Amino acid sequence: LQTRIGQVRRDLGLDSGCGNYEQLWITTSLRGLVGGVLSVEILEEGVHSGSASGIVPSSFRIARKLLNRLDDVDSGRVLAEVFHASIPPERVEQAKQAGSILGDTIWKQFPWVSCSHAPAGHEQACLSAQPTSTDPVEAILNRTWRPALSVTGAAALPSLDMAGNVLRPKTVLKLSMRIPPTVDAELASRELKQMLERDAPYQARVNFEADWAASGWHAPAMPAGLSALLNDLSLQTFAKPAAYMGEGGTIPFMNMLGRYFPEAQFLITGVLGPQSNAHGPNEFLDIAYAKALTRLVAGVVAQAQV
């Protein structure tokens, strides 16, 4: 395909996100992703918990101990520096600008549960569960330029109606770690496997089978002419200037395009904004914004020589 396309001058990607539905949002980076399945086995078969607990360690507790190697249980900060990267100053500045636009909507957009209890004297202040940071700039940087670990699935756990007084022989967890845009995913995946499998507690059988290793993407510097054009089109379309922000998701194709076409100008944008809930059960698009953004992108194509 590269030989058929030839030299690419401009690359438009339209499956990214937006901070709100009031202006053009230009994606400056995408996080990478490494992940896989962690299996912890301590017995050949399940046994009576009354007979075995206290002698046989819980496979779930061993899994917890292994996960503690990866991130801090209180803050969620990923511990190993191999998963971190320095944040370019211009991206910090853009995060500050985006934070000033979005304010606390950067974290209030998510469907938090209401508080079940609150410290004495703070009942009115505690209306919902809270994020890792309420500072908009830190929240943006946390989800765009810092690694984060999630457990996205589990196996070898019976359903509640089938669970009995049995000490289970194993625990299996599906792990997903988002990594900064400039971290090498293959290197991070190898390190993740080594961190989980070495020195297994109680000499348990521990195996991590990697299934994802996709590096992120960091946008090249945008030419002044293209930046001015995008700002003008945003003002014409939305009556507000263009804004810049990284995204926390992963589009492996972008990293590949960046490698194959290093001289190309990139405009990555999209309609996945507040409450759009990408990949969720009620994913939706703001139709009015999608139509407006389509007109704006048509303007970019019409002025392809800028």
Q: Model-flagged regions — what are they?
A:
Residues 133, 138-169, 176:
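A structural supersecondary motif
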Residues 90-98, 217-226, 255-260:
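Short glycine/threonine-rich loop-to-helix capping motif typified by GTGT followed
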Residues 188-197:
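Short amphipathic alpha-helices in soluble, non-transmembrane regions
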Residues 39-41, 46-48, 63, 145, ...:
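Zn-dependent metallopeptidase/amidohydrolase metal-coordination segment
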Residues 79-94, 131-134, 157, 211-213, ...:
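A glycine-rich phosphate-binding loop feature that marks nucleotide/adenosyl-phosphate handling sites
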Residues 1-130, 141-147, 260, 282-290:
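Fold-level recognition of mixed alpha/beta catalytic cores in primary-metabolism enzymes, strongest
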Residues 177-180, 207-223:
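A short beta-alpha structural unit
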Residues 43, 68-76, 197, 201, ...:
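Generic secondary-structure signature for well-ordered alpha-helical cores
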